[in-house]
């Protein structure tokens, strides 16, 4: 195969996506768009918080713009260590490890902790980074029906022949905004003794008395073996982290996870901003109360919206083309929303993903509901 025949093959594959509205492009976002942004994950609007910006600037003065090395060489700084310790204390764990991204953290954890002879039971709607890591591990991977604790129990009953069993779930799912039944999974762990890996990416900042997530709110922190969180959503910075009760998990990942080892480390300024965000979130419980109030207000007024209290509200269209038209109509009305289509979601489940945030007012949501009702008329 020559480069020209490869180019033809690539173009052909791309053209196959256009008729169904599945061809994707990236658009450079302007600093000022005039739109109310309901597409990103900055749920507490911390990305522009003065405390985070101040912390990042002070770190830039000390460390410069880059960590300049991988963490095992010299990229791991006092700032990264301080963030790990703060995150662990905040969420009720003993040990922490900072990663460059949520994808790297999930993929790194799931590709090296399980191995051949082990079984991974993973929720069917778990993030792609978790599924990809699990498939790379060499372990047997079985996906159970979304949020189906009964099926999970059935699979656990039949899991005795495996050396180790891992259960992998999220606390709040990114496309539907629904919650896992963490207490029921914790009860299963007490019976079966599996290793539980929980991704709290979309729950951080929104749940818990201290804002550390749904595990805190549900009182199941002690049952979790690996807690995965992100610094780039509600915490308004960049990167991710994993938390553990046992130091051997941290040490093993430092030694065996290529995603951690073979890359220039997260800039210290991002770690500093994240540390400031944790301090802010823990002190500002009223923001979480207001966020939940907004979620309830919007769901009550939007016909057909799913029950829940997370900041994520899907509006299902089914096919991609009408969903893309609806997104354009909402932009004209002053709202930027995320257009989600296969393969991110299953075929026939294309949707607008509306991400609420605490900078919104009820009047904003009233206008959004009116615009959506016009679309569906």
What kind of feature is each model-predicted range?
Residues 50, 54, 58, 62, ...:
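PLP-dependent enzyme catalytic core of the Aspartate aminotransferase-like
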Residues 142, 146-198:
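Active-site phosphate-binding strand-loop segment of PLP-dependent enzymes
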